Amino acid sequence: MEFIAPCHFGLEAVLKKEILDLGYEVSSVEDGRVTFAGDENAICRANVFLRTAERVLVKVGSFHAETFEELFQGTRGIAWEDYVPEDGKFWVAKAASIKSRLFSPSDIQSIMKKAMVERLKTVYHKEWFAESGASFPVRVFLLKDEVVIGLDTTGESLHKRGYRKLTAKAPIAENLAAALIMLTPWHKDLSLIHISEPTR
């Protein structure tokens, strides 16, 4: 299986090291995300142990699209029945487009949802879906007309782990805070005071 781990821009190298430390093979590093290979256990392990990732997605497909028709056909060509059961609740939770001809997130989401419905109608021989079962949110990234689609396994964003137990005037996302610490020479045998006062 192939997975996508989005992260804050500039933290790709930190996330890559985390993934390698978990024992998984990184297949690509791009702006704001790292793609890696793993088995089904990687879904749980990545969601629990990756401190700098925003979420973990199962990569379900990728293709080139410059028009909404190409987006529709590419999305419909994905075997959604392998991921979404007949009663599954599915939607495109987020669409991000950078330097692509298709740039309207709401239009991208709408076209993709229609394509998913058309695919599942053909497979399940149904005209209407109650979507009363488990949730299957989908996320899509467009970069220079290259479309990458992932199925979200995380739910609430991973930056909300331990969310706001202690508040401050300028709170920082937990995954960003973890990345900042990982970029310092600190290790578990040192107190954090060594970061700001290295002479102590």
Explain the meaning of each model-derived region.
Residues 133-142:
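Beta-rich nucleic-acid/ligand-interaction surfaces
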Residues 109, 113, 117, 137, ...:
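Hydrophobic, well-ordered secondary-structure segments
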Residues 190-199:
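Residue-level detector of conserved catalytic or cofactor/ligand-binding positions
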Residues 2-134:
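Non-catalytic nucleic-acid substrate-recognition regions in nucleic-acid-modifying enzymes
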Residues 5-11, 15, 21, 37-50, ...:
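S-adenosyl-L-methionine
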